[in-house]
């Protein structure tokens, strides 16, 4: 039986990404696949779902990630232990396809995850629900009328917007780190 693993910080169907993910899981099941959904347990607890649930992390991990974001503008780069634990679960599941919706949301370390995905050589589908994956900080650059992301982010006009950083602006470094991590998977295995 083929296996699908989807990743998103929220599971609840009151959010667009949670609903989309659950509906894709139901469609996969209806077509004979085994469906798994990985999400931030600390943010959503246990919710009804037809797919097998893979809760990731806990409240302490989310709090540490929140602090790394708010103080150092390093969103997506904390939760190291939770990410390594999740990778062990991915190995156990051994999915045929990994479908990423969002990986921001205080629950995964994208560098660790993408280093693993690049080595696994499995197809990765990434549905782009917002702009965070290709900017140095923000989710929606249009709110600030900013087009720095086209060349290189830095001095982010939305530093204090979600995911807010109150001390540092590391949008230049974040842009570099994301580009390196997100392009580490062979193009033939990455579908965006």
Task: Please state what every model-predicted region is.
Residues 2-192:
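Catalytic cores of nucleotide-sugar-dependent glycosyltransferases that transfer UDP/GDP/TDP-activated
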């Amino acid at each position: 039986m083929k296996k699908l693993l989807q990743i998103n910080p929220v599971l609840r169907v009151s959010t667009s990404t949670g609903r989309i993910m659950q509906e894709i899981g139901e469609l996969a099941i209806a077509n004979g696949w085994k469906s798994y959904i990985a999400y931030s347990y600390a943010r959503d607890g246990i919710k009804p779902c037809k797919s097998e649930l893979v809760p990731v992390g806990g409240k302490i991990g989310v709090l540490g990630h929140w602090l790394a974001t708010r103080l150092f503008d390093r969103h997506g780069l904390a939760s190291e232990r939770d990410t390594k634990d999740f990778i062990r679960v991915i190995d156990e599941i051994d999915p045929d396809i990994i479908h990423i919706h969002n990986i921001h949301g205080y629950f995964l370390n994208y560098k660790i995850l993408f280093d693993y995905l690049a080595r696994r050589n499995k197809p990765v589908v990434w549905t782009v629900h917002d702009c965070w994956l290709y900017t140095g900080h923000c989710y929606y650059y249009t709110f600030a009328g900013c087009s720095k992301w086209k060349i290189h982010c830095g001095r982010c006009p939305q530093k204090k917007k979600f995911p807010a950083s109150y001390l540092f602006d590391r949008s230049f470094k974040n842009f570099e780190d994301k580009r390196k991590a997100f392009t580490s998977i062979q193009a033939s295995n990455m579908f965006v």
